[in-house]
Amino acid sequence: FNIVNDKIHLTISRFFGPSLGKVNIPDSLIIKLNNYIDEIIAKDTNEAQLNDYGPNLAGQVKQEIKLPKHIVEGELLDYLISISKLYVKLSTTQEITKFELMSTWIVRQFENEYNPAHVHGGHLSGAGYLKLPNSFGKTIQEKKKNIHGNINFIHGTEQFLSKGAISEKPCVGDFYIFPHYLFHSVNPFIG
């Protein structure tokens, strides 16, 4: 179902046990986060290396950059709190009384890199898209659906009236929110 709050349009889907929320990241946040990453990469300093969060994560990617406190505080934190509260209320009818952000990072995924199936700590997780390549590449089998670069959500096994997994083609601005225990992965892309 779809819920429109003052500023948030949240879609909740139940493809399997846990609910999956999807919202759009405000353009102002996309610009702020992209500018921050572009600046530290362009400076050619060791800031990107100092903030390298890759060793703590499941991904097989070269650049996973932890966001510093000054970038998270303010608009980004307020946004994450708002969507978390709305997601929990709509999924469970419960109210969040305490919110603690454990960590945030940006994954810069390039050709042939991927994130294997994994879960996170805490209670809720999220994944958003700030930039995407012009092309995810062609499939080897032309008649098959192109899932290059897709994000996958996996829960249980496929059975009557229940999918075991879904695969979503990302768009810039998509943000998914889900329980921390929901396995998710990101496919590699070509080109």
Residues covered by each model-derived region:
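Non-heme Fe(II)/2-oxoglutarate
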Residues: 1-94, 105, 112-115
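A general secondary-structure signal for short beta-strands and their flanking turns/coil
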Residues: 16-18, 99, 121-123
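Catalytic core of non-heme Fe(II) oxygenases with the double-stranded beta-helix
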Residues: 102-177, 187
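Short, charged beta-turn/beta-strand-edge "cap" motif at the junction between a beta-strand
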Residues: 182-185
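Short, intrinsically disordered, charge-balanced linker/junction segments flanking boundaries
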Residues: 190-191
